[in-house]
Amino acid sequence: MSVVDFLWRFPSVQMAWRNLGRNKLRTVLAALGIIIGVVSICSLGMATAAIQQQATSQLGSIGNEVSITSGQDSDTDGVTDDQVDTMRNLVTDAEVVPQKTNSTTVSSRNGREVRVSVTGVTNAAALYNLTSGEAPTRLLSGALLSNSTATTLGIEEGDPVEYDGQLYRVQGLIEEENAFGFGGGELVLPESALSEQNHYNVVTIVAADSATATEIGGELDEYFNTEDEEELSINTFGNAGQVGGFLETLSLALLAIGGISLVVASVAILNVMLMSTVERRGEIGVLRAVGIRRSEVLRMILTEAALMGALGGLIGVLLSLAAGLVIFQMITGDPLGALQWSGFQYLVYGFGFAVVASILSGIYPAWKAANDRPVDALRG
Amino acid sequence: MSVIELTDVVKRYQNGEEVIAALDHVDFQADRGEMVTIIGPSGSGKSTMLNMIGLLDTPTEGTVHLDGRNVTDFTEDELTEERRSGIGFVFQDFHLLPMLTATENVELPSMWDTSVDRHDRAQDLLQRVGLGDRLNHRPDQLSGGQRQRVAIARALINEPDILLADEPTGNLDQDTGETILTELTRLKEDENVAIVAVTHDEQMLEYTDSTVRLVDGVVTEVSGR
């Protein structure tokens, strides 16, 4: 038995299919409304999914970090050694990396100058990735310089860089993966280079993932701060922080716009179904006269609406998939990202919405046709 | 026992301020294997009476008995079930569904009964009304007489006790009308069905067993009994 034969065992489907075929132009136009609605919902949804995916991959490097600076109620101008020791005692499952910061001007032999921020840190490996090789876990001599700064100044690995009257040999170049940039270049030196500063400007805690980072942040906040007194300012970027919240708002707004077009489409379906049931009033009267039940007429007309929605939805989903591949290629550079659930889900939702909206639009015409008294309907 | 019986039936319509009695204390009955013709000028209440007999409408006063059961106060859904199982309709302008083939149109009343396969009976009925070579034609590919025969086959698909025909020859030429009437006469015996036909076509009286003449909602003459 073929699929068609199987479907023909459902009289509502058979009748609905034949009825839709009677006025093909009208069916196609109504389905077109649904197609446009589905494509707008799906492609807007997939665009936000692509943006979100791209943003999270870029935020990934700081998402698992806790950043601690001196709080507004602190007596000192930084984080003290004692506080760092306490943190190390409290936090056992993450790397605690205290840093001293400053800024300086680095110049090259040819006289070109670049202003960079200076970070004094021992465990450089926890914070930096180098273009080649590994950053040292104990940076005791030598320096690391951002790749872009090095390129600008013509400095290569092994060249000396001066800071505070001392020369440091560049041991490695820092790979700048962070799209959010934090401005210019960075010079990383041993902690001893900034020894005239008593306190740490920043303590970074590097955890395994953003959930752990958030947990650690909360734990430290509870230990060091009270409601009235902020000894330390503790920041986490977990859950992609504010950026994630913004993206969620954006995606909701875009989906709402897509939703409006689907509402318009379902009004069109309501209109088409209403017109076609009014036109076929006499015919439905015949059905009722020969003993077709009200529920069966209702089902037949609802099936018509559902078929129209499914037809439009299916075409809409196929077009959206094509659009999604293009969108993902443009935003993330990987078209297959559209097939991952984060993007693909919008195709499922789009199709579901199309069918549900169409059925909802069919309810009133179907109810009206089914409850028309056969003796009235027969008069046409 | 009569298969359908109207007793003292009154049907009134409200038309603005005015109340019109379309049927005024009408009695009627029909037996299996009998053809009864209701005849009268237009506006005499023929169609209203046929709607009562066909359980499409309910009387304002009086009772309707189907096969000895009082169905006067049945709900719309109960009436639908009775029509489905016991009554067949033939309409003046055929009322075939244009997107269905002849066979599918005949199957239509039992379409939602997936428990029974009426396909063979539909084809058999079409063969018996002489349309064995038109099984898969659509209504627009059939002549008026052929369409009416499809409609008759459709009315018989559920093996009804009563077949109602509203002006069955109204849209047909003289010769085709006679063929249809011969067909109906044969079927009432073969299928042991009561045929109730409404017409203003005097030609039908040659084929009928009894005639009810209706004027202004009142039965003026019953002949042939």
Feature map (PLM): residue ranges:
Chain B
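ABC ATPase NBD coupling module
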Residues: 20, 71-88
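Conserved ABC transporter NBD signature motif
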Residues: 62-73, 224
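Short coil-to-helix segment of the ABC ATPase nucleotide-binding domain corresponding to the Q-loop/switch region
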Residues: 100-108
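Conserved ABC ATPase signature
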Residues: 138-148
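Hydrophobic anchor residue at the start of the ABC signature
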Residues: 152
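Conserved catalytic motifs of ABC-family nucleotide-binding domains
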Residues: 159
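Catalytic Walker B motif of ABC-type/P-loop ATPase nucleotide-binding domains
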Residues: 163-166
